[in-house]
Amino acid sequence: MQDNSVNETKNIVEVGIDSSIEESYLAYSMSVIIGRALPDARDGLKPVHRRILYAMHELGLTSKVAYKKSARIVGDVIGKYHPHGDNAVYDALVRMAQDFSMRLELVDGQGNFGSIDGDNAAAMRYTEARMTKASEEILRDIDKDTIDFVPNYDDTLKEPDILPSRLPNLLVNGANGIAVGMATSIPPHRMDEIIDALVHVLENPNAGLDEILEFVKGPDFPTGGIIYGKAGIIEAYKTGRGRVKVRAKVHVEKTKNKEIIVLDEMPFQTNKAKLVEQISDLAREKQIEGISEVRDESDREGIRVVIELKRDAMSEIVLNHLYKLTTMETTFSIILLAIYNKEPKIFTLLELLHLFLNHRKTIIIRRTIFELEKAKARAHILEGYLIALDNIDEIVRLIKTSQSPEAAKNALMERFTLSEIQSKAILEMRLQRLTGLERDKIKEEYQNLLELIDDLNGILKSEDRLNGVVKTELLEVKEQFSSPRRTEIQESYENIDIEDLIANEPMVVSMSYKGYVKRVDLKAYEKQNRGGKGKLSGSTYEDDFIENFFVANTHDILLFITNKGQLYHLKVYKIPEASRIAMGKAIVNLISLAPDEKIMATLSTKDFSDERSLAFFTKNGVVKRTNLSEFESNRSCGIRAIVLDEGDELVSAKVVDKNAKHLLIASHLGIFIKFPLEEVREIGRTTRGVIGIKLNENDFVVGAVVISDDGNKLLSVSENGLGKQTLAEAYRGQSRGGKGVIGMKLTQKTGNLVGVISVDDENLDLMILTASAKMIRVSIKDIRETGRNASGVKLINTADKVMYVNSCPKEEEPENLETSSAQNLFE
């Protein structure tokens, strides 16, 4: 047999069967992949779903009109757009109406549309349907030339190639389907989280997956349940493939003599009736011991499957068997496979977010062009009306003297330089529009159109304006379809929380001028008497020195606030532990600082209670207060804590609790100002603040204290190592923004002020850092109390300049402690 030989008498082309099968199978495969089984990455719909929604749109079945028989909808879909079996189309319609299948239903069904027990829907002649508000948003603006239309199967009608889709349907509702040689399994998600992620990507196009995971916690199934472990979620979002364990949500009820396990939520796509039957069979066959009865008490209020246990049965053991042997625990495979540019592709989460944003930008640009052309056309006609109204007498006379409408039209065009469209509009104008009121309406409409045209042109010319429209519409969708998370996400039950393995102990965390950070056990620093030489707290580079330190427990959350007003989170135990003399690790390896960014304040907290706030103090005397709860979110790039004036920078930040009454600001030249806390009200993160102190020339803020009682004591330290304790009441209160009073008497002997701290608890030690990296620990009670205008006593005998001071918990006196010699102080 010769390939491709033509029998001219019979007009038959002979081909090899192998090549024919190969070509036919490839054509069939692509038809199934592109035209049937996989969703589009932009609107998240398979062709059958898209055709159903478009057919309902053409029938006018909005969410506000009466329901129409499902058979009518299916008939329109089959006859006009989808020449396949009616059962396949009806099944697709039914699924879009099931609240246990869709996170956001696209069809509002009336009648029996099936159940989570696997019951089939009633026949299409009995059920009725219409669109939901969500599907209306998917089709919104379709009549404004926003998408391309293609011929239907018999080339008699047009159907949409894609839908505008204002909402991210692919990620919100997910998708599943089996094609030829490939399959997709995209889980549903919570609308609020996806919208927040889209807005973040819109504002930060280079955002990484770590930032997106702050918004998208994971899948959110319509049936609830619990996802265990985040590793599979992260892997799926990173590569497009992953697996997650999903468990039913249960609770245990106790009666007088036994326990009852109640199943409240199901794993996604689990048949409840089959699960109940499966549990009953396992109990009857003694594969699971301890179950006396299983019954389904579910109703319209929700799912309730009751598993009664025998008297001696332990619920924890029974539950472990149920998870192992039944579909109370399932594995959901995530495959982010979708169609884009007529080709199937596995996407990452970030790619899907970018694709949807690009789709929305394209839709908005096309809609804007459509509205712009429409507005221009209307404005063109109104310009003709205004010309006619300004010359009404002449126009009436010209029309009266014309022999025909055509002649009148030509005369108007020639006399007033009008277009043909304008001339026709004038000739068709009603006489009532010649009244003064109608004239004003025309002028007002024309003016509004000019403003609209200018606005639409602005959207087309400005990327920022376009992004603003996308963001506004996304937030509108979020507000309209916001709902609580249904699926709980927990750490894997196979993993142990790392914090459980780390002792919660006090640590000294130090940071050098060049940004090297470390933590050292507090016990490594022995207490010395006042006037001691100190111990070396860490080695540094020749031109580096330790400039900041603080004491916190290993489980605490550290808040790093930079000179640029950015705030970063970090657990204390994530800072590498080192010896006293070690240099530490560069902070840029732990948090993502900008090249010109420097840590200026570090605070520790155990939680983000809204009963506390953060007070920020800048070098130029600005103070600001923001509720601590606003800083709970954490981003790799940090979050904005304060907006700074040009040339200003942050110098200090403090935690303010409910007992705080005053704030005190101290300057380099020893000037203090104390004012009521209520004079600094709480404001948002992205704001500037108010003036706290008016500074003299060459002066700047070096520290601040939160005061809860006038009996509080303040400890001031100068750069030459002198210090004193003073009662807070010694500083008279003023109004915020004043010039302040002398807080410490400064001389050439004392040097300028380095800092001021609160020392209400005498069971504290003072730790002092010098420029050469020496640290001395002194008991607070050894520093005598003096008036505000005193210079204080010598705290450290060294020629070094004091750089920073802070307090730390008192250490127990070691037994048989000997005084160290000068030679051993640096060992």
From Swiss-Prot:
Top-tier EC class: isomerase
Record-annotated active site: 126 (o-(5'-phospho-dna)-tyrosine intermediate)
Motif (GyrA-box): 528-534
Keywords: ATP-binding, Cytoplasm, DNA-binding, Isomerase, Nucleotide-binding, Topoisomerase
Keyword rRNA-binding attributed: no
Reactions accelerated catalytically: ATP-dependent breakage, passage and rejoining of double-stranded DNA
GO MF annotation terms: ATP binding; DNA binding; DNA negative supercoiling activity
Highest taxon listed in the record's lineage: Bacteria
GO cellular component: chromosome; cytoplasm; DNA topoisomerase type II (double strand cut, ATP-hydrolyzing) complex
NCBIfam families: gyrA, PRK05560.1, PRK05561.1
Function: A type II topoisomerase that negatively supercoils closed circular double-stranded (ds) DNA in an ATP-dependent manner to modulate DNA topology and maintain chromosomes in an underwound state. Negative supercoiling favors strand separation, and DNA replication, transcription, recombination and repair, all of which involve strand separation. Also able to catalyze the interconversion of other topological isomers of dsDNA rings, including catenanes and knotted rings. Type II topoisomerases break and join 2 DNA strands simultaneously in an ATP-dependent manner.
Miscellaneous: Few gyrases are as efficient as E.coli at forming negative supercoils. Not all organisms have 2 type II topoisomerases; in organisms with a single type II topoisomerase this enzyme also has to decatenate newly replicated chromosomes.
Family membership: Belongs to the type II topoisomerase GyrA/ParC subunit family.
Name of the protein this chain belongs to: DNA gyrase subunit A
Organism: Helicobacter pylori (strain ATCC 700392 / 26695)
